[in-house]
Amino acid sequence: MPKTQTLEQTKLSEPKMYKVILLNDDVTTMDFVIEILMNIFHQNLEKASQTMLEIHHNGSGICGIYTQEIALSKQKKVMDAAKLANFPLQAKVEEE
């Protein structure tokens, strides 16, 4: 008698996505924010300038949307770079 094999189907769901948000402050320079957006979030100069102005005018701005692990990694990179440059720039991660 031939062996039969049952294949189990597993439904994969999309991972939860998280927004990385930069918060405006009165000390961090616009140039530094643009540098962060280009180096950590890989935005080109035009997009980085637009995002920086959104942060400046609205108090915060979304820099990107990622899986949780990547979002937290980018948040840490922002915080580390800001600390190294003696800026109080803050980043937060929120579920989308």
From Swiss-Prot:
Gene Ontology terms: biological process: protein catabolic process; proteolysis
Gene3D superfamilies: 3.30.1390.10
InterPro entries: ClpS, ClpS_core, Ribosomal_bL12_C/ClpS-like
Function noted in UniProt: Involved in the modulation of the specificity of the ClpAP-mediated ATP-dependent protein degradation.
Xref: HAMAP family: ClpS
SUBUNIT field: Binds to the N-terminal domain of the chaperone ClpA.
Protein family: Belongs to the ClpS family.
Name of the featured protein: ATP-dependent Clp protease adapter protein ClpS
Native species: Campylobacter jejuni subsp. jejuni serotype O:2 (strain ATCC 700819 / NCTC 11168)
